[in-house]
């Protein structure tokens, strides 16, 4: 189909500026509100830079990417997914770079607000821990409710991954692990393996087709987040985080500021 000359999807850098500008604006808005309305230090959100937090970040990057890679492999091996090109002929494009930048910004933006700002503000008001988890995950899920091709099961899984991110934040007292997981979960999903990301169009290294009869596993047009495999790996992420945090020697979610 012919694209209009000002269609931003035809110009990846314009698309990045349009989408990324709003995301960066959201980051600064959250930080400014936290600093000047909540009157707290920025690092108190869980953004302190130190070697331990960077290890958390790397673990999050690994866990998010590995989870989505295993979903891809399982669907491929069971015949629920097929490639339009060879696995050894990935299609690198400018989208590989622009969406990496975008998903890095999205990871920071959503974790700073949905985990950092919401949970820490509620904690400062002496809400119970379970309420911190539930409200953060619920608001996170509802935020995605207007996405294209949204499904009830997709929103449930987004709520579940919100709980996982909350647990990562709780277990490490840092945003760095959920930020890392969030970045690679999205990027590997859409820009490596070519799945829709929460219902939005992918620009992957691979073009794929999924079996229409296997929507319960693949998530259909919403992407893997709308399928049972994502549910399994989100739950597995809780156990992986628990094992990691025990080795890390972290305590419970308590403010140091």
Regions inferred by a protein language model and the residue ranges of each:
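N-terminal, membrane-interfacial amphipathic/helix-forming hydrophobic leader that caps
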Residues: 1-42, 46-49, 190-257
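Membrane-interface helix caps and helix-loop-helix hairpins in membrane proteins
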Residues: 83-86, 143-152
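Juxtamembrane helix-loop-helix connectors linking adjacent transmembrane helices
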Residues: 1-17, 41-109, 119-124, 254-257
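Membrane-interface helix/loop boundary segments of multi-pass membrane proteins
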Residues: 109-135, 167-174
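Small-polar-interrupted transmembrane alpha-helices in polytopic inner-membrane proteins
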Residues: 103, 129-145, 158-159
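Membrane-embedded alpha-helical segments of multi-pass membrane proteins
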Residues: 20-28, 93-100, 113, 156-160, ...
């Amino acid at each position: 189909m012919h694209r209009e000359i000002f269609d931003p999807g035809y110009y990846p850098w314009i698309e990045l500026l349009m989408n990324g500008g709003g995301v960066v604006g959201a980051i600064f808005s959250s930080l400014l509100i936290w600093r000047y309305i909540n009157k707290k230090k920025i690092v108190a959100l869980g953004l302190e830079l130190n070697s331990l937090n960077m290890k958390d970040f790397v673990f999050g990057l690994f866990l998010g990417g590995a989870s989505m890679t295993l979903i891809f492999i399982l669907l491929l091996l069971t015949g629920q997914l097929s490639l339009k090109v060879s696995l050894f002929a990935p299609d690198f494009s400018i989208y590989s770079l622009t969406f990496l930048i975008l998903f890095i910004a999205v990871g920071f933006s959503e974790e700073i607000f949905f985990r950092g700002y919401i949970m820490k503000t509620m904690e400062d008001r002496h809400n119970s821990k379970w309420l911190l988890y539930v409200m953060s995950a619920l608001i996170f899920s509802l935020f995605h409710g207007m996405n294209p091709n949204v499904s009830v099961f997709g929103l449930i899984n987004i709520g579940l991954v919100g709980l996982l991110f909350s647990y990562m934040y709780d277990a490490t007292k840092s945003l760095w692990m959920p930020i890392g997981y969030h970045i690679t979960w999205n990027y590997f999903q859409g820009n490596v393996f070519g799945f829709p990301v929460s219902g939005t169009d992918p620009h992957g290294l691979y073009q794929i087709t999924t079996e229409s009869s296997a929507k319960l596993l693949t998530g259909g047009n919403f992407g893997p987040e709308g399928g049972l495999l994502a549910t399994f790996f989100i739950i597995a992420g809780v156990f992986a985080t628990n094992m990691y945090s025990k080795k890390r020697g972290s305590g419970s979610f308590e403010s140091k500021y």
